[in-house]
């Protein structure tokens, strides 16, 4: 048993190293409207950390294009095939979501003027990204432990060191601080140990996963619709606007079920996305399905985090194992991606949650669904 635990710890450590070391090759082009010299500058090639954010790459990108930029104040933003990219979504998630067929390098366009404020929330560089990250971490802490005081009570020095470790991809530095927050790992037997619950009631001390309360895993889901007759992902039409993406914050509560040895990813997705799996046309979330605020509307740094109702989906769909038909909903699941991996639906969900989560302790899952053609009635 001890040897098995050692093996599992080794696998988890290797998975974390791969997640933190993952990168997307980027080829960044300067938009024609920002070019003031001839010939125009060549594109800039770089690696975008999967767990990183596009605004953090601006200093090196600007240095490359500095000789040709127009005078004035920079308002930097990125686009892909005409779609402005949300700066608070990690680079790896954007890539998994928008590139149905992986594009290497990923060709992006950078703008230094004309910020689309009607589409994107304003970003003031690193400070905005750090603020978004810390608020997401507070949200995750609230979901996992029932409050966010463990994050809010961090010293300024620890907050700064934690953020620097994320920016620099320093896993060891991150672990030195994040382990004190008691935000994981999640365990299958988390409902068994209840001895510490009574002693913690009425206390501000955060509870760690496994302390007797049901585990709640912070999850962000991105559901993208593709054309109904799509057989090859390289033929998927590009995303034209963010309204076609369902962006959902919804925690998954781990509940042990009789006869179930472990919770699969498929089971978790069916629970998280009843709108896509259930045969019911609609469903009102109960209290266990409330979600924290989205990154672009997160609470202030000096406030605690309280849950609110889940965002309503902009479209309905269903899910099942890869490429499986879904009854009564006219949808087909084409793909499920986590950290660039097309995951098997039978994989243990808690392994995915523990090992493929991002540094803010959220598990990001991209789901592609296609609308199935409906057969005409009466053979017509």
Curated annotation (Swiss-Prot):
GO cellular component: Atg12-Atg5-Atg16 complex; autophagosome; phagophore; phagophore assembly site membrane
PTM comment, free text: Conjugated to ATG12; which is essential for autophagy.
Domain of life (superkingdom): Eukaryota
Keyword terms: Autophagy, Cytoplasm, Isopeptide bond, Protein transport, Transport, Ubl conjugation
Functional description taken from the UniProt entry: Required for autophagy. Conjugation to ATG12 is essential for plant nutrient recycling.
Binding partners and assembly: Conjugated to ATG12.
Descriptive protein name: Autophagy protein 5
Organism: Oryza sativa subsp. japonica (Rice)
